[in-house]
Design a protein with these regions (language model features):
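Active-site-surrounding "flap" and adjacent substrate/cofactor-binding loops of secreted or lumenal enzymes
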Residues: 25-29, 42-46, 51-109
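Hydrophobic/aromatic-rich, well-ordered segments within soluble, folded domains that form packed cores
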Residues: 37-58, 180-202, 621, 628-633
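Flexible glycine/proline-enriched surface loops and loop-helix/loop-strand junctions
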Residues: 29-34, 174-178, 610-612
Length: 745
């Protein structure tokens, strides 16, 4: 799945005229690239990424409210403004979305309410007299968004992908990943985390603020600017309490699987029934928690619209990290009641902080926005309101977004491109020199069952059960949204998977592959320049959206997707020899990426190079396989498109490297670049981005995507046609010896 989001400014110049087979119209097409923006100092043979993007990176200054900006972010910003216009309109048809939006903007009401929106939940936690009572309290407050010791998600059963099932996953932490609790590198982050938690405990009245020299307590956050308000200074007692909280979370984190282990589709597939699960969580008393949850949920409006039998949800579940549950139960047995209440109290506050008054909201941003991500100021409130709407009921406003901003012609062109990419994968698999015939047959069967979804869903979600109001406080609406989403998801358990349901809104600038359904999905908002431009010659589109399409198809054959068959079932369809060959190739790619350090961190750690964080090749291998396959297959698809345009309908019959190169050589030269060169220049442009150091370091720890420079250079250096395109020779920085180039798809 593509996650990172970035900017590219394009200048289009008319360059060629050709006959479009799709429309039978003569059109003036552009090159789709902007040569004036390229570096005059850096050569593509040494650094393709900075040849295309370096001048922009060197001159662009990140706004204070941004931790990153680039091609994806520019399109996301455009969509954000378009959604805002919809929500601001008097005749907005997305009434639930508009209510959430206006509620979040009512800062006077939010400030007046202070902590009141979650005071009842905190009082319940405080009143627990023993662990049994606390278990019931956690069950009572969980449906509306209370603390989670374990996560619950609903989607297809990998063993029976047509049927929905509950998945139980590790949780219980407020830092991004378990490594933040154990690695020395994150000691400064932990120190800042303690200060933030201590401040929130002061804000909530659980600990005193530090006293000034005159003996008076220092003021809480009350400034006009949300990110520059005078800071509450916690007392030593508050800091001690926060340190204790960190120690409690550290014990939970010790049972977490790391983010590489959680990628293993086989090891995380552990079907379990209620009896076994209850036996595993005997000290926690799962049954008592479920009963309290059911009683609380049944008393809500959401239950009337979406009734749930919560115990039946646990009749059969998939446990992702079994040892986590065992460790969690031991933790619960050994922990003091005071520790558990402290954990629950802080999680309740942090979970709702951004919906509460300024003191809570600002303290939350100062850590999660500034320390972890490097932003210097909070985003404008209306932008946060749009993000809230997109997260809670994105299809409600998304339907209007599609009507106003997505032309059906783009959908038709994308359908053509996707079909071409699938055909190119078919040719690549058929011609593979390392796959055996049995595995080839299964791979071809799988790709024949791929289902592309483009633009928007045909099955819009019904939000009638979502009970939100413009007059309600944001935290109250957040609880209602949690209840709605909980009911919506849990109601699926045991039912057939709705393969028309999307996991992204149409206004999302992203794309994804879902292995359990064998679908590839491309929301409307990504189908714009620099990714897709119907006015550009094919090289730019195949290097842009074509590589993205190829990337998503490639996930069906990466380290995770390759374990699922064409019907979405977790099923080993590989021969042992072919799997061994596959792992040898992916192992070489892992080794390459393990050596990469982003240039900005090379510079940051110049005096201590041994401390510079590296890319985790094992964490990013799935996305790197997707990128590498995406580029190689998009090149083939571009070549076949050139062949068809030249009157060679059987161009796909010969997928040999020589035949592909010959077809690519027929592309017109535009703006001084060949078609093959423009393909790679377009590909590099979609990864144009600039990150703050803090965010780059966070991504290296938790993000399965490699940094943009390596999604460009790390991939291109493994593609033989890149060497042909720019004449890369030994001695150039982008050179990899042929024997060291990884070739998979």
């Amino acid at each position: 799945m593509l996650i990172t989001q970035y900017l590219h400014h394009q200048r289009f110049s008319p360059a060629a005229i050709r006959l479009r087979a799709m429309t039978n119209e003569t059109e003036t097409l552009t090159s789709g690239i902007d040569p004036a923006s390229f570096s005059s100092v850096i050569k593509p043979t040494n650094d393709l990424f900075r040849y295309v993007n370096g001048p922009w990176i060197d001159t662009y200054r990140l706004p204070d409210d941004r931790s990153r900006y680039g091609s994806f972010d520019k399109l996301a910003e455009d969509a954000e403004n378009q959604v805002r216009d919809i929500l601001d309109a008097d005749d907005c048809p997305a009434t639930k979305s508009q209510a959430l939006y206006h509620s979040f903007l009512n800062t006077d009401a939010i400030e007046a309410a202070g902590l009141d929106p979650i005071r009842d939940e905190l009082d319940l936690i405080d009143s627990a007299i023993d662990k049994a009572t606390l278990t019931r309290v956690l069950g009572t407050i969980n449906p509306a968004g209370g603390p989670d010791l374990f996560g619950l998600a609903v989607y297809g059963d990998p063993g029976d992908p047509d049927r929905n099932i509950a998945h139980l996953e590790q949780a219980g932490l407020c830092l991004p990943d378990e490594a933040y609790y154990r690695e020395d590198h994150y000691a400064p982050v932990r120190e800042a985390y303690v200060a933030m938690v201590a401040t929130q405990l002061v804000n909530a009245g659980y600990a005193p603020a530090a006293e000034s020299n005159g003996g008076d307590e220092l003021p809480a956050n009350t400034g006009d600017d949300e990110s520059n308000a005078p800071a509450t200074v916690p007392s030593e007692a508050a800091l001690d309490m926060a340190r204790h909280f960190l120690a409690v979370e550290t014990k939970i984190a010790a049972n977490h699987w790391d983010n590489v282990a959680t990628r293993d589709s086989v090891k995380t597939y552990n079907p379990t029934d209620y009896a076994d699960l209850a036996a595993t969580l005997k000290n926690f008393d799962l049954g008592s928690w479920i009963d309290a949850w059911q009683t609380a949920y049944d008393a809500t409006k959401a239950a009337k619209a979406q009734p749930i039998d919560f115990k039946s949800v646990f009749a059969r579940v998939i446990v992702h990290e079994p040892s986590f549950l065992t460790g969690l139960d031991a933790f619960w047995a050994e922990a003091d009641l005071a520790d558990l209440k402290l954990w629950a109290r802080v999680h309740m506050i942090l979970g709702f902080a951004s919906s509460l008054s300024r003191d809570f909201d600002t303290t939350n941003f100062d850590f999660y926005g500034k320390v972890l991500s490097g932003a210097k100021k909070q985003r404008d409130r209306w932008k946060r309101a749009v993000s809230l709407v997109n997260g809670v009921c994105g299809e409600d406003v998304g339907r209007e977004y599609v009507r106003l901003h997505f032309p059906e012609s783009s959908k038709r062109r994308m359908e053509e491109l996707v079909a071409n990419l699938i055909d190119a994968y078919r040719v690549s698999i058929t011609n593979s020199d390392w796959l055996g015939e049995d595995t080839k047959a299964k791979a071809l069967e799988k790709i024949s069952k791929f289902t592309p979804k483009i633009g928007y869903t045909n099955h819009w979600r019904d939000y009638s059960a979502l009970s939100v109001s413009a007059d309600a406080l944001p935290a109250e609406n957040a609880k209602a949204a949690n209840l709605y989403e909980t009911g919506y998801q849990l109601a699926k358990v045991g039912k057939s998977v709705d393969k028309d349901e999307w996991l992204m809104n149409p206004q999302t600038v992203n794309a994804y592959y879902e292995p359990s359904m064998n679908v590839i999905v491309f929301p409307a908002a990504i189908l714009q320049p620099p990714f897709f431009d119907p006015k550009a010659e094919d090289a730019a589109n195949y290097g842009g959206i074509g590589a993205v399409i190829g990337h998503e198809i490639g996930h069906g054959f990466d380290d995770q997707g390759s374990q699922y068959d064409g019907d979405g079932k977790l099923n080993n369809w590989w021969t042992d020899e072919d799997r061994k060959n596959f792992e040898a190739r992916t192992g070489a790619l892992i080794a390459q990426y393990n050596s990469f350090v982003p240039l900005q961190l090379v510079e940051k750690y110049a005096d201590e190079p041994d401390k510079a964080p590296h890319v985790n090749g094992a964490l990013t291998i799935g996305e790197n396989i997707g990128d590498l396959g995406g580029v190689n297959i998009a090149l083939k698809a571009y070549a076949f498109a050139l062949g068809k345009a030249a009157g060679k309908p059987d161009a796909e019959e010969d997928g040999s490297p020589a035949a592909i190169k010959a077809l690519l050589d027929t592309a017109p030269e535009m703006d001084g670049f060949t078609g093959l060169q423009r393909f790679f220049l377009s590909y590099a442009s979609i990864w144009r981005t600039k990150n703050r150091d803090e965010l780059t370091e966070q991504y290296l720890q938790i993000d399965p995507h490699s940094p943009a420079e390596f999604r460009t250079n790390g991939i291109a250096s493994n593609v033989d046609l890149f060497y042909d395109a720019f004449g890369v020779t030994e001695g150039d920085a982008m050179w990899l010896a042929p024997k060291d180039r990884v070739r998979i798809w």
